[in-house]
Amino acid sequence: MNNKTISISFDVQQLYYLPQYLPVYHRLLKQNAGHATFVFYHGIHDAFIKNIIQSENLDHIWVKDKAEANKYYKNQKVDWIFFGNTFPFLNEIPQISKSVQLGHGVGPKASYYTKSSTPTTVRFVEGEYRTNRLKNMYPNDNFVNVGFCKLDPIINGETTGFDLNQLGLKTEKKTLIYAPTFYPSSIERFPKNFPESFSTYNILIKPHYFSTSKDKYKKQRQLLSHWSNYDNVYLAKVDDYSLVPFMATADLLISDASSAIIEFAALDKPVIWCNFLKLRWNYRGIFSYRFKKRMDKDYNEYSNIAVRADSYQELKTIVAEQVANPHALSKTRLQYAEKLAGTFDGNASARIIDYLLNNK
């Protein structure tokens, strides 16, 4: 029996890191394998974060910026510090603690790979394909294939989804999620009366956190707010920070080229990829190379996982076809989901904790 214990700090620079961190934290507690503290950064949503802290009973501290977080880490000297992205003081961390990078998604942006240019002690990776790519790009660094821990709660039956009645929706209707990313996004390509076209369905709208919090996405917020007035729509609130209960509830996902597509496909549910995006002028025409540079070559794999809609006008027909035949693309969907996000057996978090204990 392993009697080792570890101390962990989870660096929560963004609220949307939590759905990836929490399954690891819960596994730590389940194995009675140590103690964890969550490091939150003050911002515009502190009140909502305090509610989450209370509901999850998280040991935590607040910091104002990364410099203050770094000072805290130097004082605490925990065994492992988790980061969801790059950290400017990472070169100082090895003197005090070991570090982990655990990405918050498995989307097609090139930044998935380039954020390993500043190495942590270990980066936990989703699947053999991504692990091998990263090892080829950064041969001197440490990458460990564990799978995608964010979905562990669904696979293990620990997340049951929403009560549609409590959301004011109809239980007899099929339920769609529209989960667009912030940029490049399809939101502004959808009409103002979008929910009317899908009135026979419940619609859960789960935008990216940046769409709801950053000033430059004001037009997106206006549309989202307008759609929320329809009877068949539930718009995620700030404290609905995780996509997981939305995925557990819905029958079909509509999204841009985002991590959500792979996550939902792994649950063997139909996915529609909106390939009609609102691009800034400096990403169009002669500047289209910037869009291609932003997206990784994995972008091309999305047509194997999801049914592609090249215009809003195509969407209604494709949705109806996929709802009527949800398993039509099942074999291909699962094959490519496993390629891009690894094994979905509900044990990714356990593999992470075992690694941390064995490499303390």
Predicted regions and their residues:
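A short, charged/proline- and glycine-enriched loop
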Residues: 2-8, 96-97, 170-174, 200
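Catalytic binding pocket for nucleotide-activated donors in carbohydrate/polymer assembly enzymes
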Residues: 145, 259-335, 340
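A donor-sugar binding/catalytic signature common to diverse glycosyltransferases
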Residues: 81-83, 90-101, 239-287
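C-terminal alpha-helical cap of glycosyltransferases
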Residues: 344-360
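A nucleotide-sugar donor-handling region in carbohydrate enzymes
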Residues: 119-188, 212-213, 328-335
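Short acidic-hydrophobic, aromatic-tinged amphipathic segments that line or gate anion-handling sites
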Residues: 60-65, 234-238, 304-315
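Donor-nucleotide binding loops and adjacent catalytic segments primarily
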Residues: 170-247
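Active-site and donor-binding regions of nucleotide-sugar-utilizing enzymes
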Residues: 9-158
